[in-house]
């Protein structure tokens, strides 16, 4: 099965071809809907894909993408908690609080959700967790380094237990510039922190890099203490490689994880 996988984030949109469990021909579009639409249309035409696998954290974009798919005769499947079935295999009731949901992935794998209000879980977090369990196995912590930093915890029994949401690195970087009178816009640079700041920009870079990596390290340590599990560590998102460089934790960086998870979910019949 071939799908055009679309991941709409707060600052950019990723578009890629999902075909029989593999993601290829990925475009990262920073120019808004028109640029991403062109990339998706080109993929659909050249690959013969029949469906859009859609994951979004921007609700106002949903209608435009649904209309795009309809206008071109493509099926439209959107990642939500309703892609999961209840424990009896039936449809999820409208009042879903405290329900236990699951998605079978084949080959004896699956992901269950044990969460008070599953309808509040971000679609990207669901796609990340499903993709990570399929590719890397449980138990794991999967972190998505985007505009926000999100983390999902999947325990050894393949159950999504909850997660963490924190400001993403670009929010930290931009807020210093926007909310102070004299601090400059910080450049990302190589991702290596200086030994100490010997200029304003170096001081900002040291604080941002060392401080942010310290936050990531402490989140992982606290989750390991709370659950008593030696979690695998999986990372995705546009800032993952940059933030994790030189961090003394064994993260596997998986750049196409969200697209892969979206395709995997939407390739199921639901």
Model-identified regions with their sequence ranges:
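N-terminal glycine/serine-rich phosphate-binding loop of ATP-dependent small-molecule kinases
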Residues: 1-84, 88, 92, 100-102, ...
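Gly/Thr-rich phosphate-binding beta-strand-loop-beta motif of the actin/hexokinase/Hsp70
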Residues: 1-24, 132, 138-160, 176, ...
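Glycine-rich phosphate-binding loops at beta-strand->alpha-helix junctions
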Residues: 12, 55-64, 206-209, 229-246
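Adenine-nucleotide phosphate-binding core of ATP-dependent small-molecule kinases
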Residues: 27, 192-232, 250
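Active-site regions of enzymes building and remodeling cell-envelope glycoconjugates
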Residues: 70-77, 116-118, 248-256
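Active-site neighborhood for divalent-cation/phosphate handling
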Residues: 81-90, 107-142, 148, 161, ...
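Glycine-rich phosphate-binding/hydrolytic loop that grips phosphoryl groups
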Residues: 89, 181, 251-270
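Glycine-rich phosphate-binding loop plus the immediately following alpha-helix
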Residues: 121-123, 127-137, 162-205, 210, ...
